[in-house]
């Protein structure tokens, strides 16, 4: 008795097209309608793994890690230089959920850059900022501004060590006027020194010392006087 074989079912044409359109693994350039394109690895139709994304309108280029369609891991972002037109690196570091997160270096200009911690694409944690005028800030950051304990070293060598809040000197701190050989220690509010003591400090090595040294003034209880003045100031601030 002859045995009949069932004909093998062929794949529907639309299923074949859909299967071939699915992006998985390494792919060459995949273009978007607006001209943006991506070269790299895919998983389940989204960018995942190593890859390079180019944004046509801005000229921005990201090279690095991707997870489920977002920049995640280590990567470098480059933008066109407004003067030369050539791409220059503006950020190298870690990303999470398409935002700068973890340790990274951000270049704001040829002589101005930040190296340190990031959270949600904002400077947050510990970091060091090199300003174009030669000043350097090193310390804690929050919401893209110095906040917490930190030191600002000015180009001329003078420096402030102490508390910061919202990008300004706020709280207890010391300012070393090394150019004049003096040290101020006291309390600041929004970059203004409100109360404290000034003494000579390194006056013999100062390039421009004051004409006369600060005379020694003896108070029976200098710490108590300063504490009382500080308490009065804080009370006034609370009343306002």
UniProtKB/Swiss-Prot annotation:
KW Transport (keyword) present: no
Location in or out of the cell: Cytoplasmic vesicle, Secretory vesicle, Acrosome
Cysteine pairs bridged by disulfides in the record: none
Chain residue ranges for the region called Interaction with SIRT1: 76-100
Annotated region (Interaction with TP53), positions in chain: 206-240
MORN repeat locations: 38-60, 62-84, 91-113, 114-136, 137-159, 160-182, 184-205
GO BP, one annotated term: negative regulation of signal transduction by p53 class mediator
Domain of life according to the entry: Eukaryota
Cited Pfam families: MORN (PF02493)
UniProt-listed Gene3D superfamilies: Histone H3 K4-specific methyltransferase SET7/9 N-terminal domain (2.20.110.10)
Stretches that traverse the bilayer: none
A GO-annotated cellular component: nucleus
PANTHER family registered for this protein in UniProt: MORN REPEAT-CONTAINING PROTEIN 3
Function description: Assembles a suppression complex (suppresome) by tethering SIRT1 and MDM2 to regulate composite modifications of p53/TP53. Confers both deacetylation-mediated functional inactivation, by SIRT1, and ubiquitination-dependent degradation, by MDM2, of p53/TP53, promoting a proliferative and cell survival behaviors. May play a role in the regulation of spermatogenesis.
Protein name per UniProt: MORN repeat-containing protein 3
Gene designation per UniProt: MORN3
